[in-house]
Design a protein with these regions (language model features):
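P-loop NTP-binding core
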Residues: 1-261
Length: 261
């Protein structure tokens, strides 16, 4: 079994759900921003080939290197691709669409699931917290994130098919815990895109709480136009609409995350 070198970050949180459209990226960018607002250096790693976390803070056309290069080029390291964002204490390791081809590039490489963990070790404590935006799939990128992480946060939309696919995610988590990362903890489940005006959303929220029990955060993220708009302006909800319900909810979620970790 591979060793488990110390990464020195207090929390490394993967935001993962193989279902798309559940508020995963919105949660990643705003949780990272909330952690940075507390005065601690925070790194947001974008592993989603769509690159939405990256585009929420950066003009990715200006980035000559991305996480794809970190995985496939032995001479490119995580420190080479990290860029500062406009928000104090928050840095970004951007993604590009080329990440979608990563699995075929690394097929057969025995150390492929450990590449991100090895790169995080090399940061040697530069960041207090790390947030990883995973792709909506359970492939090599998500496995890399889970192997490298201390904690996992699962966003689930309060919609009819909310729990679809969660069994597969939980099975993957258990496989990662069995060997490469026995210390991985499920930090919790956050209900997202919730419309409290509808009976269906309220029923789904109750169902999610029955399935996951006390793993579900008290904070619920409401469906919000402001949350949808803020990435277009390359801002977190905290600078785009600081008095909005979305800002209050994500800051509350951050407080719960810190308490649980």
């Amino acid at each position: 079994m591979r060793g488990n070198p110390h990464i020195h970050a207090r929390m490394i949180i993967s935001i993962a759900n193989q279902k798309g459209g559940v508020g995963k990226t919105t949660t990643a960018i705003n949780l990272a921003a909330a952690l940075a607002m507390r005065g601690k250096k925070t790194l947001l790693i974008d592993l989603d080939p769509q690159g939405n976390s990256s585009m929420s803070y950066l003009d990715v056309r200006e980035a000559t290197k991305s996480m794809y290069d970190v995985f496939v080029d032995k001479d490119t390291h995580l420190t080479d691709v990290i860029r500062p964002s406009s928000q104090q204490n928050l840095s970004i390791a951007p993604a590009r669409i080329a990440l979608a081809k990563l699995e075929s590039r690394l097929v057969g490489e025995l150390d492929a699931p450990f590449k991100l963990k090895d790169e995080l070790v090399s940061l040697n404590g530069q960041f207090h917290d790390v947030v990883i935006d995973c792709p909506p799939a359970l492939g090599l990128l998500t496995v890399n994130a889970l192997v490298a992480s201390t904690h996992l946060l699962i966003p689930i939309q309060s919609s009819y098919f909310a729990l679809e696919g969660t069994d597969d995610l939980l099975e993957t988590i258990e496989k990662v815990r069995q060997r490469p990362n026995p210390e991985l903890q499920i930090l919790g489940v956050v209900i997202t895109m919730h419309d409290k005006r509808t009976a269906l959303a309220r029923d789904i929220q109750e169902q999610i709480r029955k399935v996951f029990g006390d793993k579900v955060f008290r904070t619920v993220i409401s469906k919000s136009v402001r949350l949808e708009e803020s990435p277009a302006y390359r801002e977190s909800i905290f600078t785009f609409a600081p008095d909005s319900s979305g800002a209050a909810e994500y800051y509350s979620l951050c407080e719960e995350v810190i308490d649980r970790a």
